[in-house]
Amino acid sequence: MESLDQAALDQIDRAILALLQRDGRLTGAEVGRRVGLSQPAASARIQRLEKNCVITGYRAVVDPAALGLNIHAVVRLRTTHAQLARALDFASRTSEITSTLRVTGEDCLIFDVHCPQAGRLEEVVDALARYGPVTTSLVLRAYPGKPLAEATPSASRRKTPTPP
């Protein structure tokens, strides 16, 4: 499937995306009501956004502690190009690793890890260390994510808020 060009998204598409990022369970009728379209027109736009891979999925946000995953850590891995594919394969097969970022800088990969206990975190970290040096940080508190900012020329010119 081919992704829509940014220019192909009009203001109504952008409004729909903003609404669905905040609440992916909104019905087509409710989306239509909020953006001034009929239910069929809103649903057709949502289907087009899905078909063109602008909307790539929907998911429930689950509290890890409710599943007994009380240890949350960020693990950074510095590896070699030769080991990169193996490290990524390990991450994809390890259920405690919930997200992986390939980054620039000294580290190559950053993993979000959720474990039931410190002993399991130690096992995951030791296994990752086979691919290179690791640095582990325990997460004290995670704050809610935000919807993606609108990628428009005006958004790229917005000033970064200054601290109080």
Spell out what each predicted region is:
Residues M1-P164:
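A compositional/biophysical signature of low hydrophobicity enriched in polar/charged and small residues
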